[in-house]
Amino acid sequence: MVPQVLLFVPLLGFSLCFGKFPIYTIPDELGPWSPIDIHHLSCPNNLVVEDEGCTNLSEFSYMELKVGYISAIKVNGFTCTGVVTEAETYTNFVGYVTTTFKRKHFRPTPDACRAAYNWKMAGDPRYEESLHNPYPDYHWLRTVRTTKESLIIISPSVTDLDPYDKSLHSRGFPGGKCSGITVSSTYCSTNHDYTIWMPENPGPRTPCDIFTNSRGKRASKGNKTCGFVDERGLYKSLKGACRLKLCGVLGLRLMDGTWVAMQTSDETKWCPPDQLVNLHDFRSDEIEHLVVEELVKKREECLDALESIMTTKSVSFRRLSHLRKLVPGFGKAYTIFNKTLMEADAHYKSVRTWNEIIPSKGCLKVGGRCHPHVNGVFFNGIILGPDGHVLIPEMQSSLLQQHMELLKSSVIPLMHPLADPSTVFKEGDEAEDFVEVHLPDVYKQISGVDLGLPNWGKYVLMTAGAMIGLVLIFSLMTWCRRANRPESKQRSFGGTGRNVSVTSQSGKVIPSWESYRSGGEIRL
């Protein structure tokens, strides 16, 4: 199992820094050719990345990334939104009380948000009480407004920490980024003007638990450190390394994309912004296991080809292709020139696409230029075909040709409502829907008759009202009687003038009104 661990790390180190597995390895440096005997052929050592001259090994401790470290470092936090609930009451003349609730926003302070979060996490009843609607106050024939401020805590709110600059990333932040938590700034602004984001753990230090301490052997030549053998037994060269900080920790980014923190006496330049670190997840670990099996299979094929060469005492271009080094590093290259077996020292590099080494027809790119051929023969079984095309007799396995994108992070368990822009930015400052679910329902309510009197006062008022009602009824009846009395008298005198007649002494009937009009004297 240990050789397997040593086997795949160099290959995957170079491949993962590009996000793809290499399909081939080819020398970027090729030494002079020299003739050799058939017995000098050997299968390459794909277990280690060899470096020249560094034979002095001494134990030391270093720091590296944890196994299974993923690209997105999760930082748990919470959002805090300030909400003002306003109760407006109006009491009319007869005592009916109408209450209307309204909600608006205000920008909270970090200290108040931290206190509210601690209350919520501790189960303190003060947090739930702070969310209740205000108890409305009221006065007769007046409008009274009662307000109450509440802090809505929504947790968890998970953000991603960038290990390179310690910035925080979330769709809830303006522009998707927050510069980070510092001593002077303990919160992040959000897309919502009245909501701030704060980490669960107070303080300027953000969680960055991605490192582990390991022990290995330092490979040096005099005072110069060439590389080291990690605790898994794999040699790693410091050639081409650059300085890079992760979560504020200074370390070295190696050429294979791995990162270590170790002390060196050599001055190393800083990495350019595009130089990142290989970030492995569990999916890539599964692929690496399959790559190990494939490389072991290639090792067996190389040994079979070497055994066939020794047995038959003959060499072919196809058999020479099995002797190629499969991982980046120092090795040998073989070819046949004019029926003579030739060998050269070579330093191999990874190839991502065939266009890198075959940019045009008939060109095999080695060391940045087209490599010359001898009678149509290059090396490691690569030849020039009759049609002028470069023919490579073998490729890496189909598994190594897959262009697999590594999983970036685990799934966030909760999608914070601020991540959806449609939930915010209403017109005005009315409370948005995403906080309404965390508050009691508000509604318009109308109370019964209530003038603010005690129970005995209510009965006194009812009795007085009844007495006043009786007095009004009696007064109305009396007024009606007095109004009808003169009308009845007028009817009794004026109503007989037309119908009553008088009789004179002579017996003649004379109408009474006519006697008055004629001025006659009537004697009764």
Curated annotation (Swiss-Prot):
Residues 20-459 are virion surface. Glycosylated and palmitoylated by host. Glycosylation is crucial for glycoprotein export at the cell surface. The keyword Disulfide bond applies. The chain crosses the membrane at residues 460-480. Pfam families: PH_Rhabdo_glycop, Rhabdo_glycop_CD, Rhabdo_glycop_FD. The keyword Transmembrane helix applies. Disulfide bonds join 43-302, 54-226, 80-113, 178-188, 208-247, 242-271, 363-370. Residues 1-19 form the signal peptide. Arg-352 is highly involved in rabies virus pathogenicity. Its mutation dramatically attenuates the virus. This is Glycoprotein. The lineage of its organism: Viruses, Riboviria, Orthornavirae, Negarnaviricota, Haploviricotina. The gene is G.
